[in-house]
Curated annotation (Swiss-Prot):
The lineage of its organism: Bacteria, Bacillati, Cyanobacteriota, Cyanophyceae, Nostocales. A motif ('HIGH' region) lies at residues 9-19. Its EC number is 6.1.1.17. Disulfide bonds: none annotated. The keyword Glycoprotein does not apply. This is Glutamate--tRNA ligase. It holds the Pfam family Anticodon_2. It comes from Nostoc punctiforme (strain ATCC 29133 / PCC 73102).
Length: 481
């Protein structure tokens, strides 16, 4: 048997972190078993589905590296298949037209609520006579198509995450609506139904999705049986929770993959983190995984039942590990869009070689890619603002003389090298009879505006290459005086 799994997002919003995590688990399971990962777009909600959301979903999956083997298939292009399946259930007497109005349903719910009962449809139109149906249609009533669910039926399956699961038919809310009214007569098929038709048609062997679909699974098993199809294996993964233990939602801030991307998370870091959101590797000390490495180890026996808390600190740490170990040329490519978005210009000598030197300088201090914007601002600005500490340092006794001596020494150094920079510092220490610390602090304050920052010599070399070191030294002397 070839393992066949699917991810089936609805294009009613951008790709959500929960959907993406489900996609990761499906992808890992498929690759672990040498199977197929199928992409299906569930766009039957015509009012809320948008092409820009579809584009966002596809782009997000590609960015994460979750390449699919088949698809994308669009449910909106498969309506004839669903309507044919609805008609078969009608012809077999397994489904029927229900003419109960919304007002009648509301009255039923209120009566059940008053009696302390759980709301459910009472199946009142299951056995209408032809005359009763004709009378309702003469009234102009619209209808839905309901699938018959027997109250006494017990639905049992072995969930690969949760073990034996059991539901009674009486707990499923009465006969299930599988289609709304339509002019063709067979109805507009709804989610719980079309999912089963698609999974049968696409020969899905394993359905991997969030635990919020457990009740749907009980209903869908009955539909598989009614359509004479083999029932797939089910795995219901834990929900993603916030740190307070509630389901992660938009109220918690960022939830879409494109937002994580804009915040400066790498695809590799985010995928690594999502892999660990609910799954524990055999080696509990291993935390860094590529998709390919995780696929070799992945299995549902190590997927947790309890909800997985979204830990921003852990995500930041993982992301920083990928940034710190990304080759300079690739990391430069990743950072350029963030610099461009900040309005930084690659002119005045800021060529590719210079950019890669800058990346080498700041890379180990980055947690997110976007951190490169503030950390490199001083290299893209003609001038810098002096912090309170920087200004204080420049006014310290001896600082002005030190800076003037550095300016004089630079007159004989049209292009500064690391060795030459070190020699200038030694020369100034000797000539001015001061400690090296004063020279270094004064030079840093002059060049960067602060007393803290990245490696001073490398910063100086970068500024020298674009002709900004001398002008900043002169301005700092003015500031000191």
């Amino acid at each position: 048997m070839t393992v066949r799994v699917r991810i089936a997002p609805s294009p009613t919003g951008n790709l959500h972190i929960g959907t993406a995590r489900t996609a990761v688990f499906n992808w890992l399971f498929a690759r672990h078993h040498g199977g197929k990962f199928i992409l299906r777009i569930e766009d039957t909600d015509l009012e809320r589905s948008r092409p820009e959301y579809t584009d966002n979903i596809l782009e997000g999956l590609r960015w994460l590296g979750l390449n699919w083997d088949e698809g994308p298939f669009f449910q909106s292009q498969r309506l004839d298949l669903y309507k044919e399946a609805v008609q078969k259930l009608l012809d077999q007497g397994l489904a029927y037209r229900c003419y109960t109005t919304s007002e009648e349903l509301e009255a039923l719910r209120e009566a059940q609520k008053a009696r302390g009962e759980a709301p459910r449809y009472d199946n009142r139109h299951r056995n209408l006579t032809p005359e009763q149906r004709a009378a309702y249609e003469a009234e102009g009533r619209s209808y839905v198509i309901r699938f018959k669910i027997e109250d006494g039926r017990e639905i049992v399956w072995n969930d690969l995450v949760r073990g034996k699961m059991s539901w009674r038919g009486s707990d499923l809310g009465g006969d299930m609506v599988i289609a709304r009214a339509s002019e063709e007569g067979s109805g507009q098929p709804l989610y719980n139904f079309v999912v089963v038709v698609d999974d049968i048609d696409m020969q899905i062997t394993h359905v991997i999705r969030g635990e919020d679909h457990i009740a749907n699974t009980a209903k869908q098993i009955l539909l598989y049986e009614a359509m004479g199809a083999k029932i797939p294996e089910f795995s219901h993964t834990p929900l993603i929770l916030n740190m307070e233990g509630r389901k992660l939602s938009k109220r918690d801030g960022v939830t879409s993959i494109s937002e994580f991307q804009k915040m400066g998370f790498t695809a590799e870091g985010l995928v690594n983190y999502m892999t660990l959101l609910g799954w524990s590797p055999p080696d509990s000390t291993q935390e860094i995984f590529t998709l390919e490495t995780a696929a070799k180890e992945f299995g549902f026996e190590r997927v947790n039942k309890a909800g997985a808390k979204f830990d921003w600190d852990k995500l930041d740490w993982l992301n920083s590990q990928y940034i710190h170990n990304t080759p300079v040329d690739k990391l430069t490519d990743l950072l350029i869009p963030f610099w461009e978005a900040a309005g930084y210009k690659f002119d005045g000598g800021r060529d590719r070689a210079w950019l890669e030197q800058l990346v080498t300088l700041i890379s180990q201090s980055l947690t997110r890619l976007v951190d490169a914007v503030p950390q490199s601002q001083l290299f893209f600005s003609d001038t810098v603002e002096f912090s309170e500490e920087g200004s204080t340092q420049l006014k310290q006794e001896g600082s002005t003389a030190v800076l003037e001596a550095i300016v004089t020494a630079l007159e004989n150094q049209p292009q500064l090298s690391e060795a030459a920079a070190q020699d200038i510092i030694k020369q100034v220490v000797k000539e001015q009879k001061v400690k090296k610390g004063l020279v270094m602090r004064s030079l840093r304050a002059a060049l960067t505006g602060d007393v803290h920052g990245p490696d001073l010599i490398q910063s100086w070399l970068l500024l020298n290459q674009i002709g900004l070191d001398k002008s900043r030294l002169s301005r700092a002397i003015t500031e000191a005086n």
